[in-house]
Amino acid sequence: MSNGAFDAIFEYAWGQIDKPISGDFIYGKDLPKLIEIIENIFQKAQKSGSYELRLPLFSEINKDLFRTFSNTKTFFKIHKEEFDDIFFNLVNHPLREILENAFIGVDSIPSDFIVSMNLNSPSKFLVENKSKNTEGAGISTPRKKLTESPIKLLSRNNIGKALEVQVEELKRELTAKQSLLQENERQVSELKIRLETYQEKYASIQQRFSDLQKARQVEDNQNSSRTSDPGSPLVTGIDQKAILEEFRRRLQRQTDTISFLKDQIRRERGLNCSNDKVSHSKRKHATTDGDGTFKNFISAVPSNIWVKATIRIIVCFALLAGVLPYIRKYVYAHDTPSQNSRLQLSWWENSGILSKIVWFFEDQTDLETEYRSNANVDDAYSRVFGI
């Protein structure tokens, strides 16, 4: 590995930026320019065709890092002995390794690369040594300084003014950074105070929580000891009062239900019996009246006349029964139906004897039906309540 070739390339690029008048450093804003000078050297070597190179040397990401560094640290002084560390922190690779890997088929920078690219021009240190040697030999005299041209003096004055401007900018930047540091320190102190306050509150809350937890545990232990004792008054009170009260409440509810059902059944039975008695008495009264009249009529008429009259009545009744439908059909054929047509009585309802006979059998049937239904209700009630 040729360290001399790398040093020559680095010294050449450094000398293009670091002029003897500015000192042994470059500013952060000059870092992209230094990288560009090194890339131009390798691009010229590739164009000449003397060497096979891997270009570009630096990726776009690395170039963005260089530009960001130059923008954020514009007037940061990069000394030559600190350059390797700063460069490695930016791209995570040393500059020497990047330049040596650029040559294809060679592990290091060829020694004749410097000669082919004409990089043997005197660097800053050679210029400084030459100036020192000439001063030691007595070549330069105060008279020469007096005879310097006004253009050189003006250029030196411009450089001095530029340096003064840079110094002022650096002072302003330093003042801004100091104020920023003071503000950060103030915020840090406030945050420390708030942190201490929150720590005290947290300790207080934690203490209260532990006290409440202990009190709750003691209370639970006391309750468990009370409930675990079978002879305790609490357990006795629950067994005697709560259970008996629940039984009483259920028994009262069943008693009320039974009383309500009994009253309802009694009311239904009383209503049916009263209706049956009223209807039966009315019909019986009508029947007795008719029977009395019929008996008086029979006793007043002789037996032979009664037999003839009975035969004649039966014959007449048969004739009327056969002719009556035709007469009714003829009489009511052209009548329009009215709303009261449904209320007209049947032909047997107009006869007192026939209506009494039919009503008697219907009443007997209804009474038997009601008796059976009431008996079924009583049986169901007895089965439900166990009576």
UniProtKB/Swiss-Prot annotation:
Coiled-coil region: 157-269
Subcellular location: Nucleus membrane; Cytoplasm, Cytoskeleton, Microtubule organizing center, Spindle pole body
Disulfide bond sites: none
Annotated segments matching region Disordered: 216-235
GO biological process: protein localization to spindle pole body; spindle pole body duplication
Primary location group: nucleus
InterPro entries named among the record's database cross-references: Mps2
Alphabetized UniProt keyword annotations: Coiled coil, Cytoplasm, Cytoskeleton, Membrane, Nucleus, Transmembrane, Transmembrane helix
One Gene Ontology term, aspect cellular component: spindle pole body
Transmembrane segments: 311-327
Bias type Polar residues, positions: 220-230
Pfam families in alphabetical order: MPS2
Topology within the bilayer: Single-pass membrane protein
Role, per record: Component of the spindle pole body (SPB) required for insertion of the nascent SPB into the nuclear envelope and for the proper execution of spindle pole body (SPB) duplication.
Quaternary state and interactors: Interacts with BBP1, MPS3, and SPC24.
Family membership noted in the UniProt record: Belongs to the MPS2 family.
Protein name according to UniProt: Monopolar spindle protein 2
Gene this chain is encoded by: MPS2
